Structure formats: structure tokens, C-alpha cells
């Protein structure tokens, strides 16, 4: 951009800046805060030491945040690029934004971005995802009309347009999320396709994908950057599902001397993968790596990793697979990478990366490559006779998982991997207050990286502020709950806060749809019963604790009342129901609610077991959807 006064800025440049702003504004709340800047520099993979990045971010916040509210608005962002742009810091910032590799620019429009914005997408990602999906769905008869896709064309963006591939990929990542009976597979009219896309988006949201900026029309139009963004989230959830101690106890083999299981459990899946790779590298006598980008570009660490995890033929029924290390000494990086990938192919793991992706150190695709290796060949043995308290590994409850998925679907940052540990500095809770329209004064909030000394004090101050906001601004009932409880990760008391946040969010969504009608439990119950009787249905509910809800018949009837004729009653079991019947009804009900456009986070088990909190959210979401169609 040429030098110019702030007032003179062309539409093209404004569009470019909007695009750049959206890249940095990860949670799409219209502001950039310093942890989003940290993420940007991390993702841009720039050759800068950590202290330099911190310096740049401090300077950007200092120069850019002109009204000192602790965040950068779009106007302040424009100012950085114009007034500060000659400085080295602004140049580095601009470089970081442009460092999204393998970028294809194309014009695209979305309601949120201005007309004709330049959107970019990565050819490498498209190529990788197409090959992964082709393999995953190669035997699925429902996908024959689009699979196999050609990775070198735009097949992918057309293939997702009817919603079927997306629904199938969601079920591969989190089995049983979508009831197959709810997917429309024949006579695909525009209306029916719209329903499939609703089902895919609302189900993606329920497994923790951030889909706030994506509409069904974007997927139908096959907008590349949105399609790839959604697919990456779905694929990553599947790849990471088992990189978690309670689902994979052998990970305890990665414990270091003097480290407790509890400390290991706090690591994110990415950190565990790095720890896993280094465990095997150490055993091979090779140096450790610190990332899946710069440190793996020469493929040498990968050669050693493959050699360590390849089956040695010592277990029964497990054929030995020999890794040929001769390519290790190849002088050309690309040829060495190709040779390494040929060895990965022997393990059936040549996925996600091309030689060029390895050599360029593409962080996203290399992470996926390693996660897939871990899932196929973890090569870990659960430690015996060590002094380990295995009772800690209970895994999260259904309710905890639902809350976590809800938070992640709203795009909180950092991503919540472990409910209590990741809320101990209250940053996520404060972001959730913003989502429920409770203003947060970010200048009062301490943000990472926290100082080595007194880090916990900084986190505790945030927790105290979060509780104070809950009591005074949100008017939550927080009797006997203090900041210390959040900071300690007290499960019961943290859940009490989180539930009130989710409840308020659900009611807000409903009130927005119902032109501001205030919602209480009684109002929802009365609306449900009124709607059912008007539609001539015989079901009704007394309250959200009503045991008859376990059949899901009231939910199914309500969906049919909201969108007459959408329920196939041949699939619904009535009369004397077995547990399996109840579960099948509930599964169908939840998927159909999502298909008609209700963003339901609850799970079928919540209906079968009549969990009042989650039952409330189901009926509230349906009421919101019902009021929209009036």
C-alpha cells in the first residue's frame, strides 16, 4: 500500500485489510486481542525467537490500541497499517498475515465480508483432504455419486454441496453423532439439500467445530476457504480423538521422571503428539524436535520415527515391516522426503503430506501426518508396577464433553481440551460472557504468557473478576463460589458457572429468534404443550424432569409440529419401549432437530435418561426454531 492519509483508502485496500483482519480475529468477535496475535505468529511459522514475538505484540498493542481497551478494533487495525506501516514491526506483522502458505487467491463474497473480498485457500490442504476423504469413504454406497474426487480439480468444493459427505465425515470423526436415517440421500431438491447442510452444520457444532461464520449457502456454493476450514476441524477432531489419556492408557509411557499423571493429563493433543514423537526419537538416539514445521523439514526425524514404530513382528499375527533407511543420506531435501514417504506407505500411512509439504514445513498437514501415524502405530506399552494412580483416568463425563464442545463451537481461544484445567485462568469464561452480551473490561484482564513468578496470582485475579461479573452483571446465582474455586479447577463449582453461561446463551438465542420474548422454564413448557396440541399431537410434558420424555416421542412430535411432515413415523417406535428403542428414538429426534435448523448440543442419552438441564436446552432450541417459522 502506498503512503496516504488515513481518510484516503481505496475500496480494494479496505477489502484486503478486512480479509487480513478476519485471519487474525480467530473468534470472529470483531476485535483482535494479544493472544490472537500470538496464535498468528505461531501459525505463520516465522523465524523469530519468542522474546522478539512478545516484543512485537506489545508494540502492536501499544501503538494500535488507541482507545486503550485492551483490544484492537478494525479501525485501529487500519491505522496500524497506514500510520505505522513503515516501521519494521508493521512489516513483520504484514509478513505474518501473508505467510499462510500455498495460497490461491480468489474473489468470493460472504454476508459478513464485504462484496468481492479476496479470499485465499491452500492448494496443499485441498489435495490432502481430498485424498483422506477418498480413502475414508471409498466403500460407502451413499457417496458413489461424488467419490473418488480428483485432488487436482475443484471436485471437493462441488462434492460437499449436498451435505452427504460432510455428514459421513462427522460420523467418522465422532461415531454415531448423526443418525443415518436423518440424512436425505435421494431426490435431492434444493430444500432437501438445505436440510442436509443444516444437519451437517448443527452436528459439526455439537462436536465442537467453530461454525459461527459458515452458512448452508456457503457450503452449497462450495466456498473454498470455508469448506477447507470446516473440513480441517472435522478431520482434526477425529485424528485427535484417541490422543487422550483416559482413552489410551499406554500414553502414560510418556511420563517423565518425577512427573505425575495429573501433569501429563493437562497436555493438549498437540503437546502429547510432540512428546510421543520425541519419546521414540530419544530411543533411536536422534535429537528431539520442538515442532512439526521447521524441525521436520529435512525428513530425518521422520525416518527415525518410522523406524521406531514399525512393527517388529514380535506380536502374534503382526507381520514385521522393515523400514529402509537408505534415503536418509539423500542430499536433496525433496528426494529425501519422497523416500521417507515411500517408507510411510509401507505402514499404510502415506497421508496428508506431499514431499513439498514436508520440506516447506506445513504445520497443519504435518501435524495430521503425525497424528495418523500415532493412531495406526502408537508403539507404546502401558507402564506396569510404577506408582501411578490410575483412578485419575476416569475420562470426562458426557455433560463435561457437551459443555466443552459448546465452548469450542463458539470459537473460544485457546481451544478447550480439558474442561477444568483450561478454564483455570478464566480467559475462556470471560470470552463466554461476551457471547452472552455481558460486557468485559479487557483492560482488567491478565493475558498469557504469564510471568514465571506469580503466574497463578494473575490467573486468580482473572477468576475473581469472572465471578464478580457473574454475580453483578450477569446476575447468576453463585452463592458459595469464589474465584479460587475456578482457579483450583473445582469440578462441581466450575460446572455451576458453566451451566449458567450455557443456559443464558440458549435463552438469548431463543429470545433473539422470538423478537425478544423473555423465556423461563414455564414459558417454554407451555409453548411446547400449546404447539403440540395445536398440531393435534397427543403427547405433552409436565416439566423438564417428566419421565415420559425418555421415549423422545414429545420431541419427535414437536419437530413434526414445527415442520409438518418432516418426521417419518415408520422409524419411530411407540408402545412398550426397550432401552434400545428409546435410544433409537432419541438418536433420530436429536438428528431431526438439527436437520430442521435447531442447534442442539445435547446427546440422545440426555433424553433417554431425562437429564433436566440438557432437556431444557433441546426444547428451548426447538422453541426458538418454531418461533422463527411463525
UniProtKB/Swiss-Prot annotation:
List of residues that carry Phosphothreonine: 391
SMART domains reported in the protein's UniProt record: CH, EFh
Superkingdom classification of source: Eukaryota
Keyword Phosphoprotein applies: yes
Protein's cellular compartments: Cytoplasm
Keywords, comma-separated and alphabetical: Actin-binding, Calcium, Cytoplasm, Metal-binding, Phosphoprotein, Repeat
Name of the featured protein: Plastin-3
Coiled coil regions in record: none
Subunit note: Monomer.
GO biological process: actin filament bundle assembly; actin filament network formation; bone development; inner ear auditory receptor cell differentiation; regulation of synaptic vesicle cycle
Gene responsible for this protein: Pls3
One Pfam family from the record: EF-hand_7
Function of the protein: Actin-bundling protein.
Residue ranges, annotated region (Actin-binding 2): 383-627
Modified residues (Phosphoserine): 268, 293, 326, 339
EF-hand domain mapped to chain residues: 12-47, 52-87
Domain Calponin-homology (CH): 123-239, 267-378, 397-506, 518-627
Cross-referenced InterPro entries: Actinin_actin-bd_CS, CH_dom, CH_dom_sf, EF-hand-dom_pair, EF_Hand_1_Ca_BS, EF_hand_dom, Fimbrin/Plastin
Molecular function, one GO term: structural constituent of presynaptic actin cytoskeleton
Chain positions covered by the region annotation Actin-binding 1: 109-382
